[in-house]
Amino acid sequence: MKKLLAAAVAAVMTMSASMAMADGAIKIGEIGPLTGAAAIYGTAVANGAQIAIDELNARGGQQYELNAQDDEADAEKSVNAYNNLLDWGAQMMLATVTTNPCIAVGAQAYEDRVFMLTPSASSADVTADKDNVYQVCFTDPAQGTASAQYISEHNLATKVAVIYNNADAYSTGIYQTFDAKAEELGLDIVAVSTFTDDTTDFSVQVTAAKEAGADLVFLPIYYTPASMILMQANTMGYAPIFFGCDGMDGILAIEGFDTSLAEGLMMLTPFAADAQDEKTVSFVTKYQEQFGGVPNQFAADAYDGIYALAAACEKAGVTADTSVEDACDMVIAAMQEIQVEGLTGTMTWDATGSVTKTPTAVVIKDGAYVSAE
């Protein structure tokens, strides 16, 4: 946790320096949890976005300013942060990091005509009925479908169990499309167990999977409950393949967690830090030098999000003098015309705000994420 707080402070200090730039910069507001239980996500987003801002400004031409606000993954605090950013002069938002705050802020931004691009809020509800909210991340339905396809195409299991949070929109959204696609593909789902946000004992869920003979357990959940499930399975001597989605990214950074229990865990993610292409190597190197640690896919999505906003602004002719409302309409049109070659793939968007790109499968090996291919 101390490392997370240090990274958050470093991010804010870097952003403060960025905000001291001269007039003439397009102002981008960013909202996410820099403190609290979800700080792993929010700090990574702030850091990745800042690297992109620095690169864009270093190349000359149109300049950009980033102002990151902490919402502690709380919807009410997120709306307050949004209003603070409008008072600051934000012309568009890279926001928010988590789903429930994004839905709340998105509703307000729709009324105000402020363009929002979320790096990581993946629920379909984020963009529903809002023409001004776009996503860099995969949607929950897309993650569920892609996971079932990957498990089937790679013959990872003969029997599959699922453990998901039925009180969480992210988890439920992924499960629903996974279940539908698994049935279509003929995957044998032998056990489905649920839990809620306050669950700390997963013995019932793990026992159900074990007794059903599942050789793969699909976990469309966040990393904190996933770590508890891995500990419970280890206690019971149960060692199937555990398979998750982007919410699993961060499990290796949990303070006090025995990361050896995550060995062999697989997940679909848009980003693999061990990739050797020039863009990824450069990003990982800069991230390690500036913030320490290996960047996760949240950092990569944020980095790509800033570049997408810059590409849309350039395409549409947005400047520092463009009003918030005009910038919103101009960027909406441009987002449907641009193509961004990012860390997380080649990205295009349609009028629904959803992104099209291809996920990557990674596996934890020797305490690090590596490509599963």
Spans of model-derived segments:
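Sec-dependent signal peptide recognition
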Residues: K2-A10, T14
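Extracytosolic ligand-binding ectodomains
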Residues: L4-A7, A22-E373
